[in-house]
Amino acid sequence: MPALEKNHIYRSTIEGYSSEGLGVARIDGQVVFVHDAVRGEDCDILVMKVLKNVAFGKPVLRHSTSPHRQEPDCPYYGRCGGCDFRHLDYAEELWAKRQRVQDALTRLGGSDVTVEEILGAAQPLRYRNKSQYPVSADSRVGFYRARSHQVVEVEHCLLQKPQADALAAALRQYLAQYHVPGYDETTGRGLVRHLYVRTNCKGESLVCLLVNGESLPYETELVALLRQAAPQTVGVVLGVNTRPGNAILGDRYRTLWGEDALTDVLCGRTVRLSVPSFYQVNHPQAEVLYGKALEFAGLTGTELAVDLYCGAGTITQVLARQARHVIGGEIVPEAIRDARASARRNGVENVEFLEGDAADVAAELARRQLRPDVICVDPPRKGLAPEVIASIAAMAPRRVVYVSCDPGTLGRDVKRFAELGYLARRAVAVDLFPRTRHVETVVLLSHKKPDGHINVKVEFGEGEGKVPLDNIAKRAEEYKSKERVTYKMIKEYIEAKYGFKVHTAYIAEVKRDLGLPMYDAPNAVEELKQPRKHPTAEKVEAIKDALKYFGVI
């Protein structure tokens, strides 16, 4: 097989799309990724780069043009790296995304599951409720060029909300008027790194300036410009990020004006969103995604469910509608605070939130001897660590619902789950990111069925060959849990769910008032005899909730 030569032209047909949204052709048995290509087009392809296992090229002549090709509707397309599919019609984009998920599950995951029809967006424009504009060293505000960190100034983006574009224009005015320098990644110098905008369904915005320092010059004037540009802005926050590299979010935040968080309503639940909290960027499609996750969970009202990587607790509260109890885990402290606040505001009582990574949450569940019926995971693009998958399998849930934003790592993780006995049963792609290569997927996994079974006929009652019912009752009594519910367990539960602490004496007082024994905390009993404060009504209800949770009452 002769090697492809750089700067040579070859003729081939585009077969499909790569994970990066490029066309895929095969020339002399070698894979070539082709820019600005559409499936089915017969092209003369100029090879521009040749690597060991793949080459890159671009079409210089089309002998046939796909009916799915369209003129890009954005003047920045091809320079800005934000979109990948503006040269395709939406039907072809959806085909490409579903096929990408199918290929990942089949080739990488070794699964025979068929991906169901992709759930496309009714509105593929102006859908992003979170905008992140990098600022260059020469104070350009826009988006990165494809596969680089060179900023392309973009005044109007078809993916962002109009408020975000207006706020970006106000920042440009501020940088120019007050001679404030942008940040240079290569030298670590400069001040303004990113403009971050969150917008809710009502059109209100929360603005954050990420800076390489502790403050900005002319902060009052900046706030005035931003509020003038987007009058429905509810707060302006300064995020401090002095770390080298390209990380966006800050280590700490200071409110310059207004609120430090935004509220939104998703799936009928009010959600509190501070700057670091994870929240899906496409509101209508997020409701579709979470609805499908709830369907796959198959809840009946009796289950204990766990939501790992819970972010601001949106999926947790959705699951809580149909589960007995839901535990959410998240490593970002601000997100946990938002999740607890949202649950309290919504009156959702059958949830609790634990701060920590997925492994920490799994360890806490094991310590409490809790075995969830359903585990839902929604990890970042890197997917699940092997030890997290092992921990999930060790808890032996009946179902695992995997929400993924990267088909590649999803396929890898599906294979790891299969090695531990959990097979993919259903899969559906949901388009939360129209005009880009990114796609969300929901996969249902459950433990594989046994290889065979034996039919056994059992007769209950007295007599030869029958099983006495008295023996069954006796054995059942022997298998009852002997775990003692400690005051420490009750206190930890309340702190995790409600975000406040309770004194041991408060628990003892509530137990006493309920007529429960208190012999396991003699010091608390002694404290009840002394003059002291009594628990508030809120804490009494929290203690009762914990006692119900552990089956004490």
Feature-to-residue mapping (PLM):
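DNA-recognition alpha helix
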Residues: 486-498, 508-514
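Terminal RNA-binding accessory module
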Residues: 1-76, 306, 352-353, 360
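Extended interfacial segments that mediate partner engagement and assembly in macromolecular machines
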Residues: 60-72, 78-182, 202, 216
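Short Lys/Arg-enriched helix C-cap and helix-to-coil transition segments
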Residues: 518-531
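Short, aliphatic-rich beta-strand segments
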Residues: 153, 197, 203-212, 270-274
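Short, acidic/hydrophobic/Gly-rich beta-strand patch recurrent on exposed beta strands
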Residues: 23-28, 142-145, 210, 339
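Rossmann-like S-adenosyl-L-methionine
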Residues: 2-8, 218-479
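Phospho-regulated, low-complexity intrinsically disordered regions of nuclear gene-regulatory
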Residues: 532-553
